[in-house]
């Protein structure tokens, strides 16, 4: 190696050329007063010493980049890139590489410093030949170029003359941002590398196809450029960064990779970076090495506002300068500097998006105006400042503004300044109190916490952030749903807004739950039973059926036991409850079809209605419910609500009755009956009365009797030849019966034993009728065996008034049900079982023949409390001589709920029962029978005060677990 001479020689030695791999003698000269820094090579060292002309001279000032090349099969290669082309040197080892490369870079840097230009070396430089394909010929970029890569851009530098042999101009140098590259690739066999540009690139949208020296170079270009595009996309990808002192390239934000046009709808993640520099350097686009761009991706669609090519000489500047620019730095300091020349309030950066693209490079608007931020033109929704915390400087910084800053910087303070005077402090406190007092809204459903909680009254930065305005009652509730459930029924104590409920639904208790809590406190167990299948039929046509249910609700108004109801049931539903109010004073409603005379005596203040004298044509179900217009529907209770339950010619007495008077109306062991009359009536108008509870074994024992009964039954001709003795009729007027009520009681007491014996025979006769006799044809009843045990213990004394049991009135639907033949078999057993199940009553309906007189209807009742097995259930029945026909309405066409009949020839019994819950809280405990909270019964006939019957239009009872269907 030659030593450094006086002419400025720095290094010399034998090296290899990259293209030919031949050894040449290279000499590196420094810049002197007479010559420039250069690199020369000779064929041999001898020619160098002989001062022969060098084979080639490369001036370092013409080299825009000197770096190490790694894409060749040689490990130690240094490339000098210039407008004349690239020149590669292959060294022997790493030490020689470092020595020569460092010296070359020092000389290049010295040249740049002497010329006052910035030196920004490229990371990678490839020499390619751009083909006349795609947009290359259109934009004039063809021929040999240097493809130079940085972390931000891809620059093409022309090699050779700027004119083609055809005289066409060539682009000398052009820089393409990596964010405007949609994709890139290579074709190995053909040594082709291509890039697809987006519409925001300086060349516009299109493809650039370039040829490399070999396939390895094309592959290396693809991998290197793709990795540069993929680097650092997660941070600061769509902001353009300009640095005062160029930092390490690895720390500059970069997009991940390019995206195709069909991904234009992807969201943009804009992040603001922090930098220690407080001022920004003015950069010019004329030098392609002193700035960099970063964005997340390129989306190229048909329309655009402009391109960088239209303003290639734009100036990129920071906030210290007022020149026009299409971009600004992403630097936004989070702390306000006292010595800053800009206002204390830093505006957030904005992103400008084209009409059909998710993001685009900032472009000049050609009007000389400058915006601190980019505007989103696509979105129809404006940004909410208070929701973007990062877009605002800290509020504490605004309170740091002092008078010194105002005087030094000649800015009028636009931020709230702390008053230092004590008077100002006092005035401020008074104003705060006035504002606080004005925020008190007297709305019953609005929380009184006011909106003052949104204010920070102790701080001085109330003006830095706009206060969100809430409408009344619309503030966000922070309480959980389960916490709100504890205050469903306590609106006054709940500070939050509560749901509006309709009348009677605030308890949020399902109606079915209300009906299941009617048991006494000492009888806590639930009565669950399967309801027998029943249907409402008319002339053989089925109108509906119900499946087995274990829980149901009844139509009677019941008290709400809140401690037994789950509070979260139906909490989101609105329920309209037509049941009575929970006030015990207003729960005493008695529904009845006919109002007897003695009811008026008990309730003298109750108004009489004309509906008591009306009749119902028992021809269909519609006639029963809708046959007459109910005049008593206009009568409302004291709580102002109209009774919505289906009633007949109902009667609603006054609610201010005494418990003792109501107790007299209970089904008890009445000893009185209306006087027996001999008034004749058509036989087809008689009510056939029978008990039930003939077991399946009893039905099987008498098939021949049932067939005989079936053949002799006058069902087809609607007549019956038997002489009923278990019913009574009267033709006396309503006034006669009310005056002679005491005489009726005496007559009934004398004929009690005779009627019981005769009635027991008729009951057994009717019980022996065969209607199918299936065990599943049982209707559960509402009284338990325990209740009947208590009733039976008190039923031995038939003369006592207050120790009566429950009376059952049974309605038959056909005249053929009563047979002249009596079956005495199983009387004691059947009546004993029947007396344990019969607890409710049904209503008899008067005939039109007796509609002229209010008291022309007749009643019958049966006592199931007798201790005698044969006549236990019928000891208090009233009756007449067998020769006395009864004038009672025939109701075989009534569509009461009943089970389906197994035989067509035999009619069904349509049984209706009424579950009378305990509606009055004033009844003493001594008048209540254990296990049964039923209101006092009311007689169904205006003349007879000894019996009663009511109709419940609900088809089943959840608590009736011990009764069967009437088999008539």
Swiss-Prot record:
Q: Which Gene3D superfamilies match?
A: Pleckstrin-homology domain (PH domain)/Phosphotyrosine-binding domain (PTB)
Per UniProt, the short sequence motif YXXM motif 2 occupies residue numbers 641-644
Q: Which GO terms describe its cellular component?
A: cell cortex; cytoplasm; cytosol; intracellular membrane-bounded organelle; nucleus; plasma membrane
Write out the residue ranges of the motif YXXM motif 1: 411-414
A GO molecular function annotation here is: insulin receptor binding
The impact of changing residue 676 to I is: In strain: FSP3, FSP15, FSP19, FSP23, FSP25, RR8, RR11, RR17, RR33, RR35, RR52, S76, S97, S107, S108, T9, T28, T39 and T41
Q: Name one Pfam family in it.
A: IRS
Q: What is the effect of changing residue 165 to T?
A: In strain: FSP2, FSP15, FSP16, FSP19, FSP23, FSP29, RR8, RR11, RR17, RR18, RR35, RR52, S76, SL5_131, SL5_29, T28 and T39
State which residue ranges cross the membrane. none
Q: What happens when the gene is disrupted?
A: Female sterile. Extends fruit fly median life-span by up to 48% in homozygotes and 36% in heterozygotes.
Compositionally skewed regions (Low complexity) per UniProt: 956-968
Q: Which UniProt keywords apply?
A: Differentiation, Growth regulation, Oogenesis, Phosphoprotein, Repeat
- Answer yes or no on keyword Zinc: no
Q: Name one GO biological process term.
A: negative regulation of triglyceride catabolic process
Q: What is this protein called?
A: Insulin receptor substrate 1
